[in-house]
Amino acid sequence: MNSKLRNSLLDTALALAASAVIILMGATIAAADDAKKYEAEFTADGKLVRPSGWREWVFVGSPLTPNSLNGGEAAFPEFHSVYIDPESWEHYKKTGEFREGTMFAKELTLVGDTAGTSGIGFFNGDLQGFEIAHKDTNRYSKETDGWAYYSFGHKPEPYDDAAAAMPTAACAACHTAAAAEDMVFTQYYPILEAAKAAGDDGAGIGGKK
């Protein structure tokens, strides 16, 4: 092999190796950025900053206790559409535990029409509020098992940009008394129960592509 060809092959190999390193570094940085994207942020006075993009998180359910089935005085008469941040979803699938930093987003919608083309029932109306449940055992009290709950307004959009943690009696006490697992009402969310430590099977991955 002449030196010119050898040098050309060496240059090509070095270029490919450099490209591989750049790609690997890029993937590592992207993964770190994705993880950071789902970290809670706080203002200087300790309020939780409303996360962005929650409607693209993993949807886990939408319970409803309408006024019409509760004597006109339901404690929570709206639809509660609940999402978990994607990083915590992946962790829960693998371990069956809610990681430090887990966030659940809950968006409220009023009950709208009670009749549709599919029949009589309950259909979503207007948006009516937004809340976050956040797990951080270093930040929050042992009394709430390291969780805190935030309301960004019981109102239509725009929601508040930041919120202070609600008093324990306002939300956490009910979770302490009745939630099935780690302050989370998993008993009402079959998607979470199916995902618990189930890997990709718990996400419905598999079967026909």
Report the location of each language-model feature:
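N-terminal secretory signal peptides that target proteins for export/translocation
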Residues: 1-10
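Bacterial N-terminal signal peptides
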Residues: 12-26
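Short N-terminal micro-motifs specific to bacterial/archaeal maturation
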Residues: 21-23, 48, 165
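Sec/Tat signal peptide C-region and signal peptidase I cleavage site
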Residues: 27-32
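Sequence context surrounding c-type heme c attachment/ligation sites in exported
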Residues: 33-35, 40-43, 50-58, 62, ...
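Acidic, aliphatic-rich amphipathic alpha-helical segments
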Residues: 69-71
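Short, structured beta-strand/loop micro-motifs enriched in basic residues and often containing a Trp
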Residues: 78-89
